From Swiss-Prot:
MF GO annotations: adenine deaminase activity
Gene: ade
Top-level taxon: Bacteria
Organism: Flavobacterium psychrophilum (strain ATCC 49511 / DSM 21280 / CIP 103535 / JIP02/86)
Record lineage: Bacteria, Pseudomonadati, Bacteroidota, Flavobacteriia, Flavobacteriales
One family name in Pfam for this protein: Adenine_deam_C
EC number: 3.5.4.2
Protein name per its UniProtKB record: Adenine deaminase
Keyword hit for Ribonucleoprotein: no
Length: 540
């Protein structure tokens, strides 16, 4: 097979008319040849850090959409499913991903559960990390979220890091806001990347210390604008990622969109493509071709180097997408789960008033971090309830692995004027998280999730919309387009109920993630990410 076009040689920073010859999935020659073909041929895009589960799609369904946007490979951390099903979940993702052409490169989840302050469905200890790291299907140790464990020399954390070093595999970081001496110690442990930088100066400091910074632009956390100006001077040590991407967003685009935005800022296209296509391959030793002789024939054909509209995507010489049509085949897959609770009562979500002021989680648009604010208690019949007028809404986290009392808190900036929204996609333990305007609506939303053994929903009286997620309670058994359509309908209903957030369900899913400050809620209670300890709802 031969393909002609304008060859984009990223390494040598040149573009020339050429012809590529492919045989048995490999490039056997690239020659300069004059022709009239104007399309550009370049290496495929790579998402350098993504939790496939956040798309609510199994890997084989994720692949169908990703290849349309020129994505040929991912660096994927399966810690979402691992928190539900343990290493069995990791192997599920690997085996499902092997059945399609897209090149998934999975890591061994380093923090399952993320902390000891929440209930997960499984534990992956250092012995299981050893087993996973020994596998040729595991390419790295996934993000080390337990940075206090690194800083204070936790024995189990250090053993996990040691096994990654033993097998000569890179270690991913997760250190939002970590600066000065703490970040120096964190890096000295052997941790090489961070995708959690949310300010220019933070990323600049980490780059200066030898860390590779991954610019993240997902459905909830959006750090592109804050960090992109670092790329021209640091392009050899940066990558792009989405981290968490909901299905409706994935349908619109992937890493290709970040390339287009970077070009629009006047950044050199070769530097952009080094970040988007090349750096992940070298850092993670990926089995992905870079448009060189004898490489795997992984490349894309785009209309131009401005908008990066993808005409064709090839993986191992196979045409997997063309002009908006995906050729990734349907795969039959199982739906393993871990959901063990019975329906809740309205009284389960009632809480007495004990103080004039309460701690409130302030959610922030486009960020995973939150603020802690204090607000006057809103009381009815001696009970703390949602203060709809001031947008201080009741929130709960319900343990889905065993019947326990829900943990209750209050949250600002969800904006609901009626009803409730709930999800069993709740990083990282994936218990049920819910925000609502009344205890009754909260209870109804939680019980709908329980009925579906996982999913997302919006409820308002007798009205409700839901998307069932029967694969570990976090992924759909439907295809990407149907899942995306249902998600859009529920997202629209959440906004009809008053939510002003751009992605209310994505933001909701991070309100139980304790490793990102300031204030979060686990199934065990209200938690300060700054002091790494539980705090009381009531302010004394």
């Amino acid at each position: 097979m031969q393909i002609q076009g304008q060859i984009v040689d990223i390494e040598n920073k040149r573009i020339y008319s050429g012809e590529i010859t492919i045989q048995n999935g490999k490039i056997i020659s690239i020659i300069e040849k004059n022709h009239e073909v104007k399309n550009y041929i370049l290496p495929g895009f790579i998402d350098a850090h993504i939790h496939i589960e956040s798309s609510m799609l199994v890997p084989s369904e994720f692949a169908k959409i990703a290849v349309l946007h020129g994505t040929v490979a991912t660096i994927s951390d399966p810690h979402e499913i691992a928190n539900v099903l343990g290493k069995k979940g990791v192997y599920y993702m690997i085996e499902n991903g092997k059945q399609v052409p897209l090149k998934f490169h999975f890591g061994a989840p380093s923090c399952v559960p993320a902390t000891a302050f929440e209930t997960a469905g499984a534990i992956i200890d250092s012995e299981e990390i050893k087993e996973l790291m020994a596998s040729p299907d595991i390419y790295y140790l996934s993000e080390m979220m337990n940075y206090p464990g690194v800083l204070f020399d936790d024995d189990e954390v250090l053993k996990k890091i040691a096994w990654a070093k033993h097998f000569n595999k890179p270690i991913d970081g997760h250190a939002p806001g970590l600066r000065g001496e703490p970040i120096k110690k964190y890096i000295s442990a052997g941790i090489t990347t961070d995708h959690e930088c949310f300010t220019y100066s933070e990323a600049q400091e980490k780059l200066s210390l030898g860390m590779k910074v991954i610019i993240r632009e997902g459905s909830a956390a959006k750090n592109f604008e804050a960090l992109i100006d670092l790329l021209p001077a640091n392009y050899e040590n940066m990558m792009f990622c989405s981290d968490d991407k909901h299905p409706d967003d994935l349908i619109l685009g992937h890493i290709n969109l970040l390339c287009a935005r970077a070009v629009a800022k006047g950044i050199d296209v070769f530097k952009i493509l080094q970040v988007a296509c090349v750096n992940p391959v070298h850092h993670y030793k990926m089995k992905v071709g870079l448009l060189k002789k004898n490489d795997a024939a992984d490349f894309i054909v785009v209309e131009d180097l401005v908008n990066f509209k993808v005409n064709k995507t090839y993986i191992n010489g196979e045409l997997v997408a063309e002009n908006g049509q995906s050729f990734v085949e349907n795969i039959n897959f199982e739906t393993p789960n871990n959901f063990n609770i019975t329906k809740k009562k309205i009284s389960d979500f009632e809480i007495p008033s004990l103080a004039e002021k309460i701690r409130v989680i302030e959610a922030l648009e486009g960020q995973l971090i939150t603020n802690e604010i204090h607000h006057n208690s809103f009381i009815k019949n001696g009970k703390l309830v949602s203060d709809i007028e001031n947008d201080i809404l009741k929130m709960a986290v319900v343990n889905r692995y065993q019947n326990t009392t829900p943990a209750i808190a209050f949250i600002k900036n969800f904006g609901l004027k009626k009803g409730a929204i709930a999800s069993s996609v709740a990083h990282d333990c994936h218990n049920i998280v819910v925000v609502g305007t009344s205890d009754e609506e909260i209870c109804n939303a939680v019980n709908l999730i329980i009925k579906n053994t996982g999913g997302i929903c919006a409820v308002n009286g007798t009205q409700n919309k839901s998307l069932a997620l029967p694969v570990a309670g976090i992924m759909s058994d439907k295809d990407a387009w149907e899942t995306g359509k249902l998600y859009q309908e529920i997202d629209a209903m959440a906004k009809d109920l008053g939510s002003t957030l751009k992605a209310p369900f994505m933001t909701l899913s991070f309100m139980a993630l304790l490793v990102i400050p300031d204030l979060k809620l686990s199934d065990k209670g209200l938690f300060s990410g700054n002091t790494f300890s539980f705090v009381d709802l009531n302010v004394e």
